[in-house]
Amino acid sequence: MNRVWFVTGAARGMGVSIVNAALQQGDRVVATGRNMDKLRQIFSTVAAENIALLELDVRDEHQAKVAVDAAVRRFGRIDVLVNNAGFCLLGRFEEATAEQIELQFATNVFGTANVLRAVLPVMRQQRSGRIINTSSIAGVKAVANATFYSASKFAVEGMTLALADEVTPLGIHVTAIEPGFFRTEFLSNSSAHYGEKKIEDYADFGDARELLASADGQQQGDPAKLAQVVCQMVEMENPPQQLLIGNDAISYVMPSLEARIKEIREFAALSNTTDFD
């Protein structure tokens, strides 16, 4: 069956690759983003009957509802939602301002929720749908120098898992994808944000901009292959609720998961001391 995809953050990075992969397999796509000129440029060769380009700042709940309504008017349904819009705030906990923290959560967490609230009534009426929320390895094992990005992705993980339990009985499958490092502009100066405060006590441990600048353009992950993984997952009868993507993702996360299990067992006796006598 040809599906209708609704993709946020479609004007760059993994969003572009996911849109292209869906189109290549004969599906139709609603590609959304804040920069309409960029969307038109990227997808200028796509036949008009296969794509709809819509302006969407996910932080705007009303705009999310308007975009979803327009998508349904155009294609009649939404089979796959990919919540891909987001950015990374880099820097240590104390280096970020309150305004920067709020913007990180407004985009990565509340923006995801805004689009979900707009799309879920459509999928409930259909009694079917696939939702892909873009998390990160930072949502499984927190990354130093990306404190609030990690926190935002932990929030996405919790939201995804709870939502999956709520809507799976309605025929809607929800997955958090947890990519490692992929070769996109995600770490570039045009995309990443940095904490505005500089604290001398941390100087000897390196600067987030310097630490990650050397990795930009050298990431081993291929976003086109990630998009193929997403397409395969959409075809699964019982997709995972969480999916690590990338060899580096598994190698990064597994030691922390094993350490957590070890810690739980080590302190189980202390944990079990709180029941009434």
Predicted region positions:
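Conserved glycine-rich cofactor-binding loop
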Residues: A11-G13
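Conserved glycine-rich Rossmann-like NAD(P)H-binding loop of the short-chain dehydrogenase/reductase
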Residues: Q25-R40
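The beta1-alpha1 cofactor-binding region of Rossmann-like NAD(H)/NADP(H)-dependent oxidoreductases
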Residues: L56-V66, A98
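Substrate-binding pocket helix/loop in short-chain dehydrogenase/reductase
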Residues: R92-F93, Q100-E102
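Active-site helix of classical SDR
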Residues: L116, S152
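Residue(s) in the substrate-gating loop at a strand-loop-helix junction
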Residues: S136
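C-terminal beta-strand-loop-alpha-helix "lid" module of Rossmann-like NAD(P)-dependent dehydrogenases
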Residues: T168-A215
